[in-house]
Swiss-Prot record:
Catalytic residues (positions): R18, N36
Organism lineage: Bacteria, Bacillati, Bacillota, Bacilli, Bacillales
Keywords: Hydrolase
Organism in which the protein naturally occurs: Staphylococcus aureus (strain NCTC 8325 / PS 47)
Official protein name in the record: Acylphosphatase
SUPFAM superfamilies: Acylphosphatase/BLUF domain-like
Record flagged with keyword Repeat: no
Superkingdom, natural source: Bacteria
PANTHER family (UniProt xref): CARBAMOYLTRANSFERASE (PTHR42959), CARBAMOYLTRANSFERASE HYPF (PTHR42959:SF1)
EC number: 3.6.1.7
Enzyme class per UniProt: hydrolase
Catalytic activity: an acyl phosphate + H2O = a carboxylate + phosphate + H(+)
Domain Acylphosphatase-like as annotated: residue spans: 3-89
Pfam families, sorted: Acylphosphatase
Length: 89
């Protein structure tokens, strides 16, 4: 089980990025949150190792057809608490 913090930069706000991120999370049984912050999108996610890898790849390759990810920062976090769903906040 992994817990990650992912910041995604580029054209990721106002293009349905959070909605598509939620759909990707549901496809891979990922729990956590996605939210707009300043000029990027912030994601906290938990899931099995292989599912997290596929989730990250899906998000970075463009969760939304109108998005354009230019860079991202990934941080591994300790698994202090188990989340129960994936929400856009």
């Amino acid at each position: 089980m992994r817990h990650i913090h992912l910041q995604v930069f580029g054209r990721v706000q106002g293009v349905g990025f959070r909605y598509f991120t939620q759909r990707i999370a549901m496809n891979y049984n990922i729990v956590g949150t996605v939210q707009n912050v300043d000029d990027y999108v912030e994601i906290y996610a938990q899931g099995d190792d292989a599912d997290i890898e596929r989730f990250i790849q899906g998000v970075i390759e463009g969760a939304s057809p109108a998005s354009n990810v230019t860079s991202h920062q990934l941080e591994e976090l300790e698994l202090n608490q188990k989340l129960s769903d994936f929400r856009s906040i």
